[in-house]
Amino acid sequence: ATLDNIRLWDYQTLLSTYQELQSLRSYYRFHDVDIDRYTLEGDYRQVMLAARELDYDAVDGKARNWVNQRLKYTHGYGLAASPVNQVTVEGLPDFFVKNIPPEASVDIAIDQPRIYYGEETNHYIYTGTSTAEFDYPSGSDNATNLYDGTGGVSIGSLLRRSIYAFEFGSLKPLTSNYFTSASKVHYYRNVLQRARQVVPFLHLDSDPYLALADGRLKWILDGYTISDRYPYSEPLALSQNVDALLAGQPQLTQMAESGTNYIRDAAKVVIDAYDGTLNIYTIDENDPVLTTYQKIFPDLFTPLESASEQLKSHFRYPLNLFQVQSQMYRAYHMDDIEVFYNQEDLWQLPQQIGQNDTSGQMQPYYVIMRLPNADGEEFLQILPFTPARKDNMVAWMAARCDGAQYGQLVLYQFPKQVLVYGPKQIEARIDQNPEISGQLTLWNQQGSSVIRGNL
């Protein structure tokens, strides 16, 4: 199973491929490609997937009016999903799920494919009006839909329509004939914004990810408790070479600028893509900060045991937390006082070559593999380390994501007297191979360019 899940696709490249092959219309957009794992036909598979959201800004200018923006173009539809390690004979993704309505080539249930809440849903809409919503393109015509979910706030009364007319600065709820007693308004539809409205005291991970659980599309956000007052703990902002970690990472930058020296994987915020239902599942029951919030808001949090087994199977170790822990461990793996004082064994996060041959810090990545002495393959988040100002690999850390092992960090160190090539050295060896370098030179001609993949 480890070899069957070696990743051939990079999410940046796959995102543009999804957009080209599966957006199907100009007003559909894939915001991001997420990586998850599913048991499909008895096999544990690593899968890349993305939600097909509706981007109203891409609607043709002649069709952009109040009715279309607020009443008709209300939701995206379905997703694209493909295995990390397969391509077709044309070199394209071998889709597990594709098209509209969704067509699945594996045993995966999609009972509700509509996306009213997502990462691209940045404006408010009305449902339950007298006009049918655009559902998806169907041949020369369009399929329509009437929202029947529990999401949204009822505005059936004149008083409520008046309040929201004032709130949104539009008289349409009062002057339009489209509204009925069943009408609803949906706002705070962006999942990050929605979660922040409910739990502003949790620091949310920068990468909400999509999961298909119990036949429905779910957005999962990792929620942290943070503090700048933990005794004898070094703030993230004072760690060695922290600027390399923070580059292009606004969430981590905000965390560092606030003086954070305490962070815990406190909760998972789960938002249903169809009705916007938000559940907050507690992860770390021993976190004193979370425990305090639970006492203040006793009805806000849900015990982890209440989540369905299928939903829990998609929880993973948080990205930003792993980045912070890896950053701090560069120095704090040293347990000899003198060695630590002199910073003799300081590690760094490795460099890798990216697009346009630019060099940047390697990001953690997800794999399915069997750890030494483990019973079987599991979903891991891993990151290698190199010595400071050197490129050979000295260790790699793994965060376990599955079942009872969730949250365990495992470090594997290599003998200091043995050379183990690091990512940048492997890139150099690739460039030094005459056959490969010749192909790279050929492909980089006549306006074409080679995109270097993630190692």
Regions found by a protein language model. Name each.
Residues 1-455:
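Soluble extracytoplasmic regions of secretory-pathway and membrane proteins
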